[in-house]
């Protein structure tokens, strides 16, 4: 387990093991490391028949270099597109559920939402009515400086609540705030909100057309070679982005 999530990870593993054994699985079918360390992780990799590595580039590289069959899961930077054909209530609810589960730690949760300009205000109103807080320009700048520090994701915001991240940024938000939303324009790597944030912090973009929305989504996914895909809440046929 990750050192910062050791206790809850082990508790979850114990529950799954107990349920598996009660259902007839062999004792010890699920195991864990009580005191995690890089040395122990490398030892387990050398002894395993197959490795599923979820984590940063270092973890994935170590798995691929172990000499054993390995599946690596790296970072994700999932954008969602909401266009005119979408059910706005469903789209917003789905994003909020995804972004607040485990305080946004799942790498497949949305990191950005791209909204067509003619429904932008309606989508913004729906987010706000459901406990999401839209940062003003000054607040957006403060949160920017908290998301990325020295070119890397700030570990202090990972898995934290929106209120805690606001506090770290020097921003005051209403009690019960679910997500901090920054309205930004750039999808470039220089924009902190364009990165994977692993927390209830969301970037919101305005698109002039569906093609513009797709272009923004493609850039968000590709500028760091993220692999977790994107999500489209429109009711249209799926097609190849390269066509």
Each model region followed by its residue ranges:
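Rossmann-like NAD(P) dinucleotide-binding subdomain of oxidoreductase/dehydrogenase enzymes
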Residues: 1-90
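Conserved short loop/turn motifs at secondary-structure junctions
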Residues: 32-34, 110-115, 228-237
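ALDH superfamily catalytic-core signature
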Residues: 19, 60-188
């Amino acid at each position: 387990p990750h050192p910062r999530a050791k206790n809850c990870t082990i508790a979850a593993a114990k529950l799954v093991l107990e349920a598996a054994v009660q259902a007839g699985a062999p004792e010890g079918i699920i195991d864990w490391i009580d005191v995690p360390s890089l040395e122990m992780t490398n030892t387990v990799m050398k002894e395993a028949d197959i490795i599923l590595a979820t984590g940063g580039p270092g973890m994935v590289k170590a798995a691929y270099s172990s000499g054993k069959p390995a599946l690596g899961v790296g970072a994700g930077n999932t954008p969602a597109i909401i266009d005119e054909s979408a059910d706005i209530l469903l789209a917003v609810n789905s994003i909020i559920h995804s972004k607040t589960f485990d305080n946004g730690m799942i790498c497949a949760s949305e990191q950005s939402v791209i909204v067509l300009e003619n429904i932008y205000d309606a989508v913004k109103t729906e987010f706000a009515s459901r406990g999401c807080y839209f940062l003003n320009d000054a607040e957006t700048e403060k949160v920017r400086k908290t998301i990325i520090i020295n070119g890397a994701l700030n570990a202090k915001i990972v898995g934290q609540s929106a209120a805690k991240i606001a506090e770290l940024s020097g921003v005051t938000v209403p009690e019960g705030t679910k997500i901090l939303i920054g309205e930004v324009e750039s999808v470039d790597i220089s924009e902190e909100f364009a990165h994977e944030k692993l927390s209830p912090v969301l970037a919101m973009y305005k698109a002039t057309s569906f093609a513009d929305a797709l272009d923004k989504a493609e850039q968000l996914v590709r500028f760091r070679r993220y692999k977790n895909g994107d999500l489209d809440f429109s009711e249209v046929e799926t097609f190849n982005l390269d066509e």
